[in-house]
A protein has these predicted regions:
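Thiamine diphosphate
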Residues: 17-18, 24-26, 30-34, 105-106, ...
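Short conserved AdoMet
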Residues: 2, 90, 248
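Short coil/turn segments at secondary-structure boundaries
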Residues: 48-52, 98-99, 258
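Active-site diphosphate/adenylate-binding microenvironment
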Residues: 57-145
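A short, charged, Gly/Pro-tolerant segment at domain boundaries
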Residues: 53-61, 260-262, 271
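Glycine-rich, acidic loop regions that bind phosphate or pyrophosphate groups
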Residues: 1-53
Length: 304
């Protein structure tokens, strides 16, 4: 965004409408947008801007197509799993994601197929919403589109924190399809840890220094014990076949696939995120990360 850009923040709650350097509007989103549209009547972006935007969109589409591709022999990734489901699901199926790396990966790589079909909990990193929220979404979806599926993308970390509504979904006959992507812990926080110059510590199960013998969870058996159908796949090609079986199932279906904790993250489309880094450190890597991070502030609009 240009340094002189202004952001209009719309929210029904006064506290949440007021954001840093924004122009807040307290009110209903639809009514506010209608009013703003009238105020913008006659506005048209310049030809130069439209051409730039269209060119960037073409570049982005090409990047996503390559990012979700399963034809090359690379490690399993979130993006590949997202691409597989996106290509097979019905346009009225609803997807749910929350917490960890999946909200950003879904936002970047999912091509929305229809209105009101994407539910990504982003603001509070609400671990566990993936399954509990999906169950609630399926209850709502059943009112008008009972034949369509609710699909949850869930990491192993969030799954272990809150999974009991798998049982609830089976008990209440509200079928979910859960894509459980196992990266061995909390890999996106491990990535953040590494990106700020730190060594991996206590985010991946394999990096817990107090654990003598780390072990994998049998997610397939666990989901089955709560009444769900479940299977484990080795790669995106097997995931596609399993997803077809999940679509045909009459009850909650969990598909487990390991993904690489280090490779395959979406590298484009990121926004700047202010993360505290120490000004003084014994580690050169941490200090260098702090210096590099400070350099990225040049486009920050502090407002104070």
């Amino acid at each position: 965004f240009s340094m002189d850009s202004k952001f209009i923040s719309i929210n029904a709650a006064r506290h949440d409408a007021t954001k840093h350097l924004s122009l807040p509007i307290v009110g209903d989103a639809k009514l506010a947008l209608k009013t703003l549209s009238k105020a913008c009547s006659g506005f048209k972006a310049s030809y130069e801007w439209m051409s730039f935007a269209q060119d960037e969109r073409r570049k982005w589409n090409a990047y996503v197509s390559d990012n979700i591709s399963v034809v090359n022999n690379r490690p399993n990734s979130y993006a590949q799993a997202i691409g597989v489901v996106n290509a097979i699901c019905d346009k009225r199926d609803r997807i749910v994601a929350a917490a960890g790396g999946l909200p950003a990966e879904v936002t970047a790589n999912w091509r929305t197929l229809d209105i009101g079909t994407v539910d990504v909990e982003f603001g509070f990193s609400c671990m566990g919403y993936e399954i509990a929220g999906a169950w609630g979404a399926k209850i709502a979806q059943s009112q008008n589109e009972s034949e369509k599926d609710t699909i949850s993308f869930c990491g192993d970390g969030s799954y272990l924190m809150l999974n009991s509504d798998i049982y609830s979904s089976v008990l209440s006959n509200k079928k979910l399809i859960i894509i459980l992507l196992d990266n061995g812990g909390f890999a996106v926080i491990n990535k953040l840890q590494n990106n700020t110059g730190n060594e991996s510590f206590n985010n991946l199960i394999s990096d817990c220094p107090t654990i003598n013998e780390p072990f994998n969870v049998d997610f397939e058996a666990h989901a089955t014990s709560m009444g769900a159908m479940a299977e484990t796949v080795s790669n995106p090609h097997e995931l596609a076949d399993a997803f077809h079986r999940a679509k045909a199932s009459d009850r909650t279906y969990v598909i487990v696939m390991k993904v690489d904790p280090y490779e395959g993250w979406t590298a484009e489309g990121h926004a700047w995120w202010e993360v505290g880094t120490p000004q003084v450190a014994n580690s050169d890597k941490v200090y260098d990360a702090h210096i590099n991070w400070e350099k990225t502030r040049k486009r920050q609009r502090r407002g104070v």
